[in-house]
């Protein structure tokens, strides 16, 4: 894919993201698909051979910070990651440290660049994405405690933290106008309920904090000293009204956060910019030294990690399918699951976040659903089973993760991927261990497992694993039905994320939702999206859209089976919804 195109000599370092391209490349299609070769459109970039240049993107997920190096065609050259610590406390409290995360970012960037064989002078830009976690620091950048331990190093309220469930309910009771843009109900995972919790429980911390950041905005601030926030973060998680370019003062005053209004919202963001915008004067001398880069290296305004995955996947080339991002759903299947649809006009879907203007793709409205626990729910299901320890031993002996070993075992029992659902037998799972994010917007919902027997063997664990995956797929199917009912039509699901790396999972999602599932050829679409932010900030491409056009690749497509398999999944989906209803009635 590199040879013969002038932009092949450009290199990008990134951590998660991408979008649409008009030309088509070779696409390998599995099962009932064909392989079609189509010519790659010639680049409009200069034909001379420029010096080697690279951009870096960084992604901070729930458990690690990662960095990757890409060339201008989107090919991954090198990547690295470093683990981060998460603290769990009673009361659904989950916290992290911004200092530790920054250290992990620096290690990952240094390692990725070293593996790429590039020098600091070759790096012209860096982009960031991260989980939508809340960071509290003083005006000078010192961490501020956000939890009952009083430890200032624990200064991040992690995205999955549900301490503010009561505060979210109080806000929702007010029927505020801004709630129309979060599906009618604000989630305890969003930032204003968490800030209200701080006011009630740690008032001094609310006073001491000179800045409250979404994590990805914190990373760009620490890199550049610029306090500009991304449209993505403040619109999706802080109730900023991007379509009106304003905060709603009446909302903040009404819910008790008038202190943030008093200084003109300076502590949560006065300057709001589009993702990929070049910030400040680039890397400060201190940040550059820590990252192993040069001062002044361009830094792009950030994205939330899931949205980076959306940008990094929606533009893939699919044979015989137009690159229409309004007909594609980006589904990022990781610890949680995020499902993002774009539209040319605002579409209000009850229980689904948004519509958010320009929060992911410029000029388009974003509607965002998903589940708080997806990959985490699968991990929890496995850990609950009596055979989990034995499966772990087998997996270790085979040099595999437990999940990969279970997939291998399932494939041995069911060589045809579409028949793997039979292994679930009578077991049904509603995997809502951390509530229902959408379309019911019910943080109090809990998981349901039905159809268990006294079997404690390995193959029973395999069946539970498959049933759990089906449950994740049926939750997505339910969301798609809600979107469809309000006028958002989806033809293809574009999947990414650590929990969606296997063909078995992708085929099962296609069968469970009855919609084709496509997977980008790049192994790291979220990292790729962040690399695109860097490319835009550095001026390597004239816009983020053009970076997406040139860096998106091909897709592998998994088509849903018909007849018996389709009927079985329809019946199981009906059981899924029935169990959901009963669970609400009896709690």
Predicted regions, residues:
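Conserved phosphate-binding catalytic cores of ATP/NTP-utilizing and phosphoryl-transfer enzymes
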Residues: 39-51, 284-293, 303-326
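Gly/Ser/Thr-rich active-site cleft segment
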Residues: 60-62, 128, 140, 178-306, ...
């Amino acid at each position: 894919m590199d040879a013969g195109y002038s932009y092949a000599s450009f290199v990008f370092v990134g951590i998660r993201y991408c979008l649409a391209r008009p030309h088509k490349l070779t696409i390998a299609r599995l099962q009932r698909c064909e392989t079609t070769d189509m010519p790659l459109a010639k680049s409009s970039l200069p034909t001379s051979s420029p010096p080697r240049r690279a951009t870096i993107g960084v992604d901070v997920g729930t458990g690690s910070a990662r960095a990757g190096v890409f060339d201008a065609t989107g090919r991954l050259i090198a990547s690295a990651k470093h683990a981060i610590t998460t603290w769990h406390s009673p009361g659904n409290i989950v916290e992290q440290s911004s200092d530790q995360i920054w250290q992990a970012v620096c290690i990952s960037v240094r390692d990725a660049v070293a593996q790429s064989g590039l020098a600091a002078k070759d790096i012209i830009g860096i982009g960031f994405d991260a989980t939508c976690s809340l960071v509290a620091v003083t005006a000078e950048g010192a961490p501020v405690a956000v939890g009952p331990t009083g430890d200032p190093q624990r200064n991040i309220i992690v995205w999955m933290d549900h301490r503010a469930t009561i505060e979210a309910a109080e806000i929702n009771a007010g029927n505020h106008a801004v709630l129309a843009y979060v599906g009618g109900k604000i989630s305890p995972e969003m930032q204003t309920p968490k800030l209200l919790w701080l006011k009630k429980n740690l008032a001094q911390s609310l006073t001491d904090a000179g800045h409250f950041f979404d994590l990805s905005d914190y990373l760009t601030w620490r890199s550049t000293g610029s306090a500009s926030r991304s449209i993505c973060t403040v619109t999706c998680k802080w109730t900023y009204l991007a379509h009106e370019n304003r905060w709603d003062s009446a909302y903040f005053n009404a819910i008790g956060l008038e202190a943030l209004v008093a200084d003109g919202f300076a502590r949560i963001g006065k300057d709001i910019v589009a993702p990929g915008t070049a910030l400040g004067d680039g890397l400060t001398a201190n940040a550059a030294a820590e990252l192993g880069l040069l001062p002044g290296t361009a830094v792009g305004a950030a994205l939330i990690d899931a949205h980076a995955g959306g940008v990094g996947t929606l533009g893939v080339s699919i044979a015989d399918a137009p690159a229409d991002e309004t007909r594609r759903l980006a589904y990022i299947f990781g610890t949680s699951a995020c499902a993002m649809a774009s539209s040319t006009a605002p579409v209000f879907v009850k229980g689904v976040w948004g519509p958010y203007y320009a929060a992911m793709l410029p000029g388009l409205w974003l509607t965002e659903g998903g589940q708080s626990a997806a990959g985490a729910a699968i991990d929890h299901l496995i850990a609950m089973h009596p055979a989990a320890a034995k499966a772990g031993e087998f997996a270790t002996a085979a040099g595999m993760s437990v999940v990969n070993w279970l997939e291998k075992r399932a494939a041995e029992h069911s060589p045809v991927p579409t028949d793997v659902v039979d292994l679930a037998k009578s077991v049904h799972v509603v995997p809502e261990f951390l509530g229902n994010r959408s379309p019911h917007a019910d943080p109090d919902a809990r998981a349901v497992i039905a159809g268990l027997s006294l079997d404690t063997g390995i193959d029973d664990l395999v069946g539970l694993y498959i049933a759990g995956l089906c449950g994740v797929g049926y939750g997505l199917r339910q969301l798609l039905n809600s979107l469809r009912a309000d006028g958002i039509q989806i033809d293809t699901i574009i999947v990414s994320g650590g929990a969606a790396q296997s063909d078995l999972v992708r085929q099962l999602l296609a069968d469970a939702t009855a919609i084709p599932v496509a997977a980008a050829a790049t192994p790291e679409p979220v990292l790729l999206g962040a690399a695109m932010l860097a490319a835009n900030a550095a001026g390597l491409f004239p816009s983020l859209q053009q970076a997406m056009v040139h860096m998106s690749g091909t897709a592998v497509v998994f088509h849903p089976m018909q007849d018996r398999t389709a009927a079985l999944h329809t019946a199981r989906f009906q059981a899924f919804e029935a169990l959901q209803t009963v669970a609400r009635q009896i709690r």
